[in-house]
Amino acid sequence: MSRSISKGPFVDLHLINKVIVVRKNNDKRPIKTWSRRSTILPDFIGLTISVHNGRQHIPIFITENMVGHKLGEFSHTRTFKGHAGDKKAAGSKR
């Protein structure tokens, strides 16, 4: 179920404060955050935000298409190593 329009998008206050400081100082360094639950706002466009995936921070450059999505959607937490297959079938390809 989606969030009520009357409530507005959720963004952690500390992340908004960091964005305001970076915009004011015209700083190009990535903003480091653990807040995967925060919604991307139009104010974030053009910034690089490093989102924690549980192990490391993944740098994400924010574009217009990302507005309205959550930061965690762009920082995957699981590594896909491929499906298990039959070892005999994989070796006998011609």
Swiss-Prot record:
One of its GO terms (cellular component) is small ribosomal subunit. One of its GO terms (biological process) is translation. GO terms for molecular function: rRNA binding; structural constituent of ribosome. Keywords: Ribonucleoprotein, Ribosomal protein, RNA-binding, rRNA-binding. Gene3D superfamilies: 30s Ribosomal Protein S19, Chain A. InterPro entries: Ribosomal_uS19, Ribosomal_uS19_bac-type, Ribosomal_uS19_CS, Ribosomal_uS19_SF. Pfam families: Ribosomal_S19. Transmembrane segments: none annotated. HAMAP family: Ribosomal_uS19. Belongs to the universal ribosomal protein uS19 family. Protein S19 forms a complex with S13 that binds strongly to the 16S ribosomal RNA. This is Small ribosomal subunit protein uS19. It comes from Nitrosomonas eutropha (strain DSM 101675 / C91 / Nm57). The lineage of its organism: Bacteria, Pseudomonadati, Pseudomonadota, Betaproteobacteria, Nitrosomonadales.
